[in-house]
């Protein structure tokens, strides 16, 4: 079954959707936090984490390897349900394999975000172990916005990650309800 995660940061909405059995987790990011009025990222994130026992992905905002690792270690301590959200590449286009490997080897649950290709999924799979939980968030909506069909990339990413019982593929950047049906048909995890 394809699970539904809410990509929100508004405290009232987190409370509301946490009560819904249909919702199985939450993802956030610094932009959503700012829009929700967060002044202190850590404090606001911890408030969200207190509301729910469901998985919550909180993103690092550093752009370099050293600081991403430091932030990831701090964020992981905010709660047992926390996934540290790390971009697959930084703003310079560099693959963040060292960050992924370092945090994953510390048994820190990860949500690798802004993934666009099956090649990136392969790189991620090479960087992780087969025990610590990892979500790979593939940006379907943004791909479709540029005229690219995300379906083949999802099929390939799901196929190559099948041997990794600790990995879940997330249909990210959802644009319309039909995207859920597409994800479900592909047996996308989230």
Describe the function of each predicted region:
Residues 2, 8-15, 19-102, 106, ...:
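Active-site beta->alpha loop and helix N-cap motifs at the rims of alpha/beta catalytic domains
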Residues 108-190:
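Catalytic alpha/beta core domains of metabolic enzymes, predominantly
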